[in-house]
Amino acid sequence: MKSQVQPKLIIHGGAGSSLHGKGGLEAVRQTLHAVVEEVYALLLSGVNASVAVVRGCQLLEDEPRFNAGTGSVLQSDGQIRMSASIMDGALGRFSGVINVSRVKNPIELAQFLQNSPDRVLSDYGSAELAREMQIPSYNALTELRLQEWIQERQDNFKRTMAGVIAEPELLETSNAGRGTIGVVALDTYGKLAVGTSTGGKGFERIGRVSDSAMPAGNYATSYAAVSCTGIGEDIIDECLAPKIVIRVTDGLSLQDSMQRSFAEAHDNKRDFGAIALDANGAIAWGKTCDIILAAFHDGEKIGDTLELAVGTQVGSIS
C-alpha cells in the first residue's frame, strides 16, 4: 500500500506594487493565512487536490479585497467579466470559463466543466452553463471598484488597468494593477491541481481574454503545477506556467525551473509573478514586480511572501 504524502499548499491574491500602510498589509496577511489554514485542514482530512483548489479559490473569490469574484474590477464599459480555470495534474485535464458575468464563483463553472466534453467556454456559453447549473444571479460589484471606475471615466481612462487590491488606503495610483487569485495543492495521494481566477485587468477593451483562463497562466501535470498573476499579455507571451512545468518534467528541479524562467522574464522585461508546487512537495514562488501576495503551508507552518525585497526574486522551500 502506497504511503501517504505530506500535503502542501500555496495560494496567491495577485501581484503588483508594494503595499502602502502596515495595517493594510497585515489585513491581507490575515486573510491569506486564514484561507491557507482552512484549505490545508481539508487536505489533511484526505480530500483530493482538485477539491481543495476549488475551495481555496471560492474563499479568495469571496474576499472583496482581491480581484476575482466579489470585488472584481470593471471593464471599460462598466461591466464585470470574470475568468477562471482549473487543471487536474493527475488527469492532465484543463477546463475554464472566459468573461462570465453574474456569478459569485467562476471557479465552480470551471470545476463543472472538468467532466464535460466541451471544457472551455466563452461568455455566452458560460452564461448558459450557469443557467443550466441553476446558479443564482449575483452582483460582484463593490463600492470601491465602482468608485475606481468612475474616477477613471472622469480621467478618460488614462490608466491601462485597475488596482491590484481594493483597500481605500492601498488603491494603486499608477498602472500597476495585476489582480488575480490562485491556489496550488498537493494532496495526501501525491496528486497536484491548480486553479486561477480573475476579474481581468480593469478598464480593458470588451472581449479581452485573460491568461487565467488559458494554460499559459494555469497549468499542471503529475510533476508540477503553476498559477500565474500579473500582466496577462506578458504571461501569455512567455507561456509561463507550461514553461516552468515542462522544465520540471524534463528533469530540472522546481527551484531551477523557476530561476531560469524568471531570469528570462527579467531579460524580456516581463511583469508578473507565479506560485508553484512539484510532486515531491517543493514549494516555490517568483516575481519580476514589487510584490506577490502569496501564502503557503509547508507541512509544519504557514508562511508568506508579503515582505520580500522589491524586484525580480525567486524563492523555494523543499
UniProtKB/Swiss-Prot annotation:
<feature type="binding site">
    <location>
        <begin position="229"/>
        <end position="232"/>
    </location>
    <ligand>
        <name>substrate</name>
    </ligand>
</feature>
<keyword id="KW-0645">Protease</keyword>
<dbReference type="GO" id="GO:0016811">
    <property type="term" value="F:hydrolase activity, acting on carbon-nitrogen (but not peptide) bonds, in linear amides"/>
</dbReference>
<comment type="function">
    <text>Degrades proteins damaged by L-isoaspartyl residue formation (also known as beta-Asp residues). Probably performs the final step in the degradation of the reserve polymer cyanophycin (depolymerizes the building block L-beta-Asp-Arg). Also has L-asparaginase activity.</text>
</comment>
<dbReference type="InterPro" id="IPR000246">
    <property type="entry name" value="Peptidase_T2"/>
</dbReference>
<feature type="site" description="Cleavage; by autolysis">
    <location>
        <begin position="179"/>
        <end position="180"/>
    </location>
</feature>
<dbReference type="GO" id="GO:0006508">
    <property type="term" value="P:proteolysis"/>
</dbReference>
<feature type="binding site">
    <location>
        <begin position="208"/>
        <end position="211"/>
    </location>
    <ligand>
        <name>substrate</name>
    </ligand>
</feature>
<feature type="active site" description="Nucleophile">
    <location>
        <position position="180"/>
    </location>
</feature>
<dbReference type="InterPro" id="IPR029055">
    <property type="entry name" value="Ntn_hydrolases_N"/>
</dbReference>
<dbReference type="Pfam" id="PF01112">
    <property type="entry name" value="Asparaginase_2"/>
</dbReference>
<keyword id="KW-0068">Autocatalytic cleavage</keyword>
<comment type="similarity">
    <text>Belongs to the Ntn-hydrolase family.</text>
</comment>
<protein>
    <recommendedName>
        <fullName>Isoaspartyl peptidase/L-asparaginase</fullName>
        <ecNumber>3.4.19.5</ecNumber>
    </recommendedName>
</protein>
<comment type="subunit">
    <text>Heterotetramer of two alpha and two beta chains arranged as a dimer of alpha/beta heterodimers.</text>
</comment>
<dbReference type="GO" id="GO:0008798">
    <property type="term" value="F:beta-aspartyl-peptidase activity"/>
</dbReference>
<keyword id="KW-0378">Hydrolase</keyword>
